[in-house]
């Protein structure tokens, strides 16, 4: 139904392909046909079942998140931990000042301003991608205030840790450097202090 609302054929095809891949991946974890998967939504902010982060109806602890950026689609899957993933194409125009106004903490803005002028847009784009991944992991999305927290290096791992007023425990976020034509990041909460990420495939085209 959602695909039918997309007017451009190329964009509609990308949407359909990404969601077909999502179904195939999730079905492989549960050893069932993709068409038998049932999804549900509940908003983490207001509890409304008409919108919110998608979940499997019979998940067995499986959690997932999908992001699309142009022809690139990324799927993140975890067990018994919330997950969010985001990607932003490298060729997308970025204005670091606009990102700073919308999403960066004072520490992050200072970090961007201290960078070489030619690197500021790129750095802000990467910080934005991390923020989006965290927002998706929490399930709060745009209801999460992105400017009140900073993802900082965690001494025990390669992850960055973000302490949010809205969450009882830190959210961990890491860049996905294997994705070469986009900024990409994955975030998890409820997975302990040093989650392991295995990248099985990252294909654009």
Task: Annotate each PLM feature.
Residues 1-205:
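Core catalytic alpha/beta fold that binds nucleotide/phospho-ligands
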């Amino acid at each position: 139904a959602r695909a039918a609302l997309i007017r451009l054929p190329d964009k509609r095809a990308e949407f359909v392909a990404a969601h077909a891949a999502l179904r195939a991946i999730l079905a492989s974890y549960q050893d069932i046909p993709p068409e038998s998967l049932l999804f549900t939504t509940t908003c983490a902010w207001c509890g409304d079942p008409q919108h919110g982060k998608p979940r499997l109806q019979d998940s067995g602890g499986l959690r997932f998140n999908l992001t699309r950026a142009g022809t690139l689609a990324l799927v993140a899957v975890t067990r018994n931990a919330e997950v969010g993933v985001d990607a932003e194409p490298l060729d997308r125009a970025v204005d670091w000042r606009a990102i700073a106004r919308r999403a960066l903490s004072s520490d992050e803005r200072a970090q961007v301003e201290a960078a070489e002028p030619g690197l500021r847009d790129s750095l802000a784009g990467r910080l934005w991608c991390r923020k989006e991944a965290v927002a998706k992991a929490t399930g709060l999305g745009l209801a999460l205030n992105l400017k009140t927290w900073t993802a900082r290096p965690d001494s025990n791992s390669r992850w960055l840790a973000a302490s949010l007023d809205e969450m009882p425990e830190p959210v961990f976020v890491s860049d996905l450097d294997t994705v070469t034509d986009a900024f990409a990041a994955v975030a998890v909460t409820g997975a302990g202090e040093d989650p392991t990420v295995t990248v099985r495939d990252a294909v654009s085209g």
